[in-house]
Amino acid sequence: MDVLQKLKNNQRRIGLTGGIASGKSTITNYIRKHKNIPILDADNLSRELIKPNTYGYKKILDYFGNQIIDTKNNSEKAINRKLLRNIIFKHSESKEWIDNLLHPLVKEKMIEECIQYKNNQTIVLVIPLLFEAKFEDICTEIWLVKCPRELQKKRLITRDKISEKEAYETINLQLSFEEKSKFSDIILDNSDDQNKWINTIREIL
């Protein structure tokens, strides 16, 4: 049986997505605090899937070699995620390889988690690259966080301590808001006033 067919048809699976530094974490934290709803995070699952001795870890080590191991900050020989990000940012072929490895693994794991929550009427799936990784088919609806590029840029520079040029390049690696909005059901406006998206969530969740 196709693993997708195991998902309950009457379960509401909300795919929450948006550009980098658009405010997904802020909205996720609000839902976690005010709603008794399970939240699955694709980034967290991705981190779990590249821990030492996992399939993903071994494949990455085979591809990049020992240079990708963080030998200074841990004794477990975990992958240096900052170095990995820098590599795939600069080398498109490495990014494509990582995407082809991790996206299917994360999707499979997320489906398994959804099945575990089969008795929950509603769950939220936080998937930053929902469209890029083609996760649409596991969601029953898609919520997109709206944030102006300038605000994204400022948040990204502050959060990741990178240059303005690097911030723009990182933002441009993802699909634009305009493109994503064509395939989204709900827009959560996180431009300035949080009450905008808070009121929207109160109405529909």
Curated annotation (Swiss-Prot):
The EC number(s) this enzyme carries: 2.7.1.24
Gene Ontology BP annotations: coenzyme A biosynthetic process
Residues annotated as domain DPCK: 13-205
Pathway: Cofactor biosynthesis; coenzyme A biosynthesis; CoA from (R)-pantothenate: step 5/5
InterPro entries: Depp_CoAkinase, P-loop_NTPase
Location(s), subcellular: Cytoplasm
PROSITE patterns to which the protein is assigned, alphabetical: DPCK
Main location (coarse class): cytoplasm
Residues where ATP binds: 21-26
Family statement: Belongs to the CoaE family.
HAMAP family in the record: Dephospho_CoA_kinase
UniProt protein name: Dephospho-CoA kinase
Organism: Prochlorococcus marinus (strain MIT 9312)
Gene: coaE
